[in-house]
Amino acid sequence: MIAISAVSSALLFSLLCEASTVVLLNSTDSSPPTNNFTDIEAALKAQLDSADIPKARRKRYISQNDMIAILDYHNQVRGKVFPPAANMEYMVWDENLAKSAEAWAATCIWDHGPSYLLRFLGQNLSVRTGRYRSILQLVKPWYDEVKDYAFPYPQDCNPRCPMRCFGPMCTHYTQMVWATSNRIGCAIHTCQNMNVWGSVWRRAVYLVCNYAPKGNWIGEAPYKVGVPCSSCPPSYGGSCTDNLCFPGVTSNYLYWFK
């Protein structure tokens, strides 16, 4: 985790509270882990095996409507990035990532975690109090960071790309549009008492979204600039939809809720 000073934390808290939803600075890393996909799965399994989640909560950690809204919003944002992306992959729902998100949300800890998973996964957090009309009220603040972000064009990367952010943070947005982060799983949890930067929030609505593969690698751009779908990985077989490298998913949303 990148630490932020008490002064900047207080300022950030003040700025974000004006929107009724608070987001937390997320981490960046200098290089991808050398471990393969099975290590990610092993880390997820270890977390779920050790998590103390009441059985009543295990039945459903996010509604079908909320899941669809989050997934569709991410793909909409990813397909409309500017400058356009040549290798932006279509994002699909991952049940294991969602279960992992619930295990962390159930702790009601306002911080990223667990730490051993963050080597493999990206994570965006959001919290608010009071009623809300749509789950996207907790998600859109991540995208709103785009107004403060300057994309690093190829000529800016010599060889490492600079991170040009002219606001409190931009890494929630960059994680949303990280081209290779093609899986997402989220959970929402109501915390009766949650400590948010020194203040106790009553009945805080806590959203955790996990992403894989992890994005926000230091020195790298979120995606490759170019004609949409012109640099898709070979595994996609040339399939493209709405400017996204499309995997030809055959299962529908209901599959995840059987």
UniProtKB/Swiss-Prot annotation:
Residues 71-211 form the SCP domain. GO terms for molecular function: peptidase inhibitor activity. Its main location: secreted. PROSITE patterns: CRISP_2 (PS01010). Residues 1-19 form the signal peptide. It holds the Pfam family CAP. N-glycosylated. Keywords: Developmental protein, Glycoprotein, Protease inhibitor, Secreted, Signal. Residues 20-60 form a propeptide. Weakly expressed. Expressed at low level in prostate, mammary gland, salivary gland and thyroid gland. The keyword Cytoplasm does not apply. GO terms for cellular component: extracellular exosome; extracellular space. It is found in: Secreted. The keyword Glycoprotein applies. Glycans are attached at residues 26, 36, 124. Belongs to the CRISP family. PANTHER family: CYSTEINE-RICH SECRETORY PROTEIN-RELATED. Serine protease inhibitor which displays weak inhibitory activity against trypsin. May play a role in facial patterning during embryonic development. This is Peptidase inhibitor 15.
